Amino acid sequence: VAPHRGVKRRRTVSTSFDSLEAVRLRVEIADEDGVRELPELPGGGAAFVAFLSFALARGLGGQHPLIALAEHLRREHRLRLGPFERFYEGVPEDEEDTALLERMWQPAAELEEAVNGLAACLERDELGRALAERGAAPGLLAEVAALRELLREPAARGARVRLSYEL
């Protein structure tokens, strides 16, 4: 059985980002120099966290433009979505949360490849852009472009990355 990955269901996520204003993405890198947090993304990364959440929920039968965007990436762009499914709440409440958060580390190169694919889709694919806009994530491209730049050097060095979010 695969480990639980993704957002805990503690709050309802609306299709509007008004309820996500307080969401902040944390991107951590682990390499020979230790663990460090990368700079914050534009908008705190709220649009990217929403995309991650909907990408993770795509197999549950829900309908949302960001779920459709994830499916479009998988089917039409042949993008592996697994790297987008490895994130967790960044403030553990117990030992189980701590263990799950620790299991979210992944190769930075794999996340970089997925982020590059998402960025290319949002930059060049009219349907991809439209789905992001309909999903109330107009800031997604700016966040993904910033993350792409932040991941370039750690990915080239073989570092690991962990995505988490804070409410």
Regions found by a protein language model. Name each.
Residues V7-A159, Y165-L167:
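Acidic (Asp/Glu-rich) sequence patches and key acidic residues
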